[in-house]
Amino acid sequence: MSVNLPTIVVTGATGFVGRPVIDRLLQESVMVKCLIRNNDDRNKFVPHDNLSFVIGDITAIETLNIAFKGAWGVINIAGLREFWSQDKKQFYKLNHIGATNVFKACLANNIQHVVQVSTPLAFGAPASIPFNENTPAGPHPSNYGRSKYLGDQAGLLMSQNQSLPLTILYLAAVIGAGDNKETMEVGRALKGNMPALIGADTTYAYLYVRDASEAIVRAIMKKETIGKQYLIGKERATTREYFSIIGDIAKVKVPDRNIPEKYLVPMAKVMELVSRFSGKRPQLPLDVLRTTQQGSLLFDGSLAEKELGLTYTSLSEALAEAIAYIQQHQKD
């Protein structure tokens, strides 16, 4: 182990995006330190001479100060990536206050570069599409989008007023192996548990998980990205096209019928009420309906392609990997 290499601390290292970021960082001449919640999380990684762990929590700034001491860079991936939580305050505790803690700890420990990983949903419903990095945010239909926006804004304010060396990446909807959450609905489609589509003709941008990790690592390794924001992702598909690709790859029947969101709101409200007591995620979170109601979320990601030199994997390849992963784990 070389003590002369710069250390990069990664929050959210055990997550869907975090694990590929660790793999990619270990290809660089850096030391990688994973912020983990408990010692059992170490078992999620293959041992490596340049890999270490520190126990901490983005909601406890004192643990961040310990974790960041002596580090060169920080990648903040930790947060709540969901459209529902039994306690909606968790979105803001993790995505806003947690991110703010990360930025404060970076300043306190003289971190040379911090990359904040965010989402295009932080732009809410912009006045025009496709939007770019300079487009003002519009109203936010989801707690996830608004909480991420608030966290990003906290970082931008510190960048302007306190010289926080910040880069923000807004990742399109991430697809690939290893996603154990239900946000992208791949597993549900494979089970045939989807009676109809919602927002069938709404278009979104998608991003292969290893393209996401490549963008994150390139951003932190280039000092020229400090002070900049990048929208990451290029592959586009309507919801109908998205599930059609899943059906074609997996040879399963997927719905083609669309139900307008306004007819589903009463049912979704009842589901959320039940979920508030059961603690189980509703099949149709209200924030999903509100997000699809706002229409297509299209952005211009050409700046990242140009300045980070990114090329993108096709949506069909990303979905094929996600499907294979889910099918394998269903067998296991």
What are these regions (language model features)?
Residues 92-99, 115, 147-148, 205:
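Short alpha-helix in the Rossmann-fold core of NAD(P)-dependent oxidoreductases
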Residues 40-41, 51-97, 105, 123:
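NAD(P)H-binding glycine-rich loop region in Rossmannoid oxidoreductase-like domains
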Residues 218-283, 301, 306, 315-332:
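Mid/C-terminal beta-alpha module of Rossmann-like enzyme folds, strongest
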Residues 180-184, 198-221, 227-228:
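Substrate-positioning beta->alpha
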Residues 7-28:
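N-terminal Rossmann NAD(P)H-binding glycine-rich loop of SDR-like oxidoreductase domains
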Residues 125-169, 173-174, 195:
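Catalytic helix-loop patch of NAD(P)-dependent Rossmann-fold dehydrogenases
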Residues 165-204, 246:
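NAD(P)-dependent short-chain dehydrogenase/reductase
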Residues 97-143:
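Conserved Rossmann-fold NAD(P)-dependent oxidoreductase catalytic core, especially the SDR/UDP-sugar
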